[in-house]
Amino acid sequence: MNNYQLTIKEVLYIIKTSRNYGKKSSAKLHTITVKELITDVLNLKYTIDIILTELNSVDRVKMNNYMLAILEAVEYIEDTQEIISSLSNKDTSAKGLSKLPKPRLVEIFLRLENLMYRIEDILEVTNND
């Protein structure tokens, strides 16, 4: 098993052990408190930051399917982070998020949740090759 495969397995493990997403439907997100929603957003954001650190730690020496999957996942993460930054007026701290209207928080949560699914899909396909 090479370094790329180990990194992919590690990231998939992080995703599978942090299943604090996928448990709430879009409708339910509108019924929970803002505090719960902010906590969920921050937890997802923290998990994604860990994943990005793990993916960026790989030496980008050899281009193969594993490396291409890692680069694709990093690109999705960075693109989503830009969108989240824009949606949150460039303040993704708890204090900054608390100033946002609830529909905006729901949108941020759903984007982060979707990102987790996309990363998982990209890496699972490559891992199973």
From Swiss-Prot:
Domain of life of the organism encoding this protein: Viruses
Keyword terms, alphabetized: DNA replication, Early protein
GO BP term, example: DNA replication
Family: Belongs to the podoviruses GP17 family.
Free-text function comment from the UniProt entry: This protein is involved in the replication of the phage DNA.
Name the record gives this protein: Early protein GP17
Organism: Bacillus phage B103 (Bacteriophage B103)
